[in-house]
Amino acid sequence: MSIRILLVDDHSVVLDGLRMFLGLDPELEIVGQAADGTEAVKLAHALRPDVVLMDLLMPVMDGITATGLIRRQLPEVEVVALTSVLEDEKVIGAIRAGAIGYLLKDTEADELRRAIKAAAAGQVQLSPQVVERLLHEVQEPEAPEQLGDYEQEVLRLLARGRSNDEIARALSVQEKTVKSLIGDILAKLGVPSRTQAALYAVRTGLVTLDEAAT
């Protein structure tokens, strides 16, 4: 089954380019596009994509606000932030809002396609440098509930960049069980995304910075 993608950007030339690059991969299906955050939230509800590629700077409603709304209302939909310049404030805002990762708009087409597939698989992909930066900037969850041993093992694998399928195979369970467990983990930690859960794992020593997703 193909990965369903919603494109969000207020520049038509960017949308056209993304359509061209992504359309070359038979595993990817573009189901819609939006020009601002408000439209993105509406289309996310209507289309239920697997992944939203979200521009951060847009009129009406910015991408960070839209990301937060989508992640709270549709937690099964992953969001990858798109940015033209790597600005700490914007990237951190996107991660806080629940984005699983981010990409620069000049990212090579192959890397873009890989990142979308990784996001659809629930795979956190951040460089050690970015993880280190986010550890200093993204707030630690307030009074998180304690995780059980099994949940800690799932979180450890998630923080190491394993996909849902890889975690399922490592633990000899079904993929839907992994998704349910991760949902429980996010709820207990009080965080909106796998990325913030992975940061929590590094902070608490469950994994080292070197072990964290790359």
Pin down the residues of each PLM region.
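Acidic catalytic/metal-coordinating carboxylates
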Residues: 36-39, 61-65
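Short, flexible helix-to-coil linker/hinge segments that flank and couple to helix-turn-helix
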Residues: 89-96, 100-153, 206-209
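Recognition helix of helix-turn-helix DNA-binding domains
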Residues: 161-196
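Active-site residues of response regulator receiver
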Residues: 9, 55, 83
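Short amphipathic alpha-helix used as the core "switch/output" element in two-component signaling
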Residues: 42, 64-76
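Basic, Lys/Arg-enriched C-terminal extension of HTH/homeodomain DNA-binding domains
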Residues: 187-214
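Active-site beta3 strand of CheY-like receiver
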Residues: 47-53
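Receiver (REC) domain active-site loop signature in two-component systems and cognate sites
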Residues: 58
